[in-house]
Amino acid sequence: PTDSSYALVCHLDDKTAVDRLRRIRQVDDRHHLTLLCADLSEVANYAKVDNQQYRLLKLATPGAFTFILDASKEVPRRVSHPSRKSIGLRVPDHPVIHALLAAHGEPLLATTLILPGETDPLNDAAEIREQLPNDLAGIIDAGACASTPTTVIDLTPMRTGEAPEILREGGGDWTRLGL
C-alpha cells in the first residue's frame, strides 16, 4: 500500500522479481518502473539531480508524485529506460510503505498494481489475492487505500533549460509546484 494505490514491489537487484513485475503488468522494458525512496537523500543516490530539480522535489515530497530523472550509475541497467537511461522515483507518504522501506534499508522497485486491460489500480488486499493467487510472494494488507495513480512528471527536460513535462495527472496536485 502507498499513498496512491497498492503497488507491486521488489528488491532492486532481484532480476527474477523485476521480470515478474513486468510479466504481471504485461509491460516491456520501455515502461518506467519506479524506485520508492524513504527520503530525498536516497533519490540523490539513484538519480542525477540539479538544484532546480531538487527544489521541485523538495516541494512535492513526500506525496503522490513520480518524477522521471536521469538515472545514476547506481541504477541497474535492466531497470532504467533503455533508450533514455532514466528512472522513475518517488517518496511516498504512507506509514506502511515507510515502515517497509525502513525495514529493508534501501529503495524498493515498484509499479502501480494495475492489471492488464484495466485502467484503475487494485486497492484491496483480498481482491489482489483473488486476482493474483500464485504470482506474489506476499501481500501486505493495510486495508483499502487510495486508488488514484501518482502524478508523473518528467524532469529530464530541465537539464536543457526546458520545462518539466506532465506525463500523467494523478493524485499529486502539480499546480502547487508552480508548473
Predicted segments with their positions:
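Active-site-adjacent structural elements in enzyme catalytic cores
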Residues: P1-L179
